[in-house]
């Protein structure tokens, strides 16, 4: 007996697992695509209160990617899983953190990283005036992303969910 499941069956299993966690069609959209050399599951989070990490943990159990000894992806029968926020949710997440990011940006001077209140992240401005988001939670930390304030705010929201006062 084979353990192979179709992409449609995997999509149904993901929907059932999400539903068991209380996440239905109003919270998460699950779509399956099949094509000549593989298939994919596309999961879009439709509710800003849903943590994408929780959805990703369920969905990525269905991912199957065959690789050679060098790590290159082999053609055929791969199942890719994509989990992302819906665009409307991205805007809500960014808006919930924007004031904190703007406050931190206003405090940056010289070669410093200013913490964003309530997060393990900080913002900096380089010599050319561009903003960037940094992980300041550990010694290892590092650069996460550059961009305008709303882009950095969305990046925080994608990692942490809604800001506490927005919940």
Model-predicted regions and their roles:
Residues 1-2, 43-45, 84-88:
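Charged, low-complexity surface segments at secondary-structure and domain boundaries
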Residues 3-10:
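Short, surface-exposed ligand-recognition loops at beta-strand->loop->(often short) alpha-helix junctions
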Residues 11, 15-52:
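Amphipathic, interaction-prone secondary-structure segments
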Residues 51-167:
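Intrinsically disordered, low-complexity regulatory regions enriched in serine/threonine/proline
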């Amino acid at each position: 007996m084979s353990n192979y499941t179709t992409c449609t069956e995997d999509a149904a299993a993901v929907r059932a697992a999400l539903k068991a966690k209380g996440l239905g069609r109003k919270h998460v959209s699950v779509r399956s695509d099949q094509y000549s050399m593989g298939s994919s599951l596309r999961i879009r989070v439709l509710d800003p209160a849903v943590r994408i990490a929780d959805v990703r943990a369920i969905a990525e159990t269905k991912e199957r990617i065959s690789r050679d000894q060098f790590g290159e992806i082999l053609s055929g029968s791969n199942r890719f899983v994509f989990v992302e926020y819906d665009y409307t949710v991205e805007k809500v997440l960014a808006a919930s953190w924007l004031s904190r990011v703007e406050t931190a940006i206003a405090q940056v001077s010289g070669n410093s990283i200013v913490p964003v209140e309530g997060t393990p992240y900080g913002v900096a401005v380089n010599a050319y005036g561009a903003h960037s988001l940094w992980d300041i939670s550990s010694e290892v930390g590092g650069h996460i992303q550059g961009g305008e304030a709303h882009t950095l705010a969305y990046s925080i929201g994608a990692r942490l969910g809604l800001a506490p006062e927005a919940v």
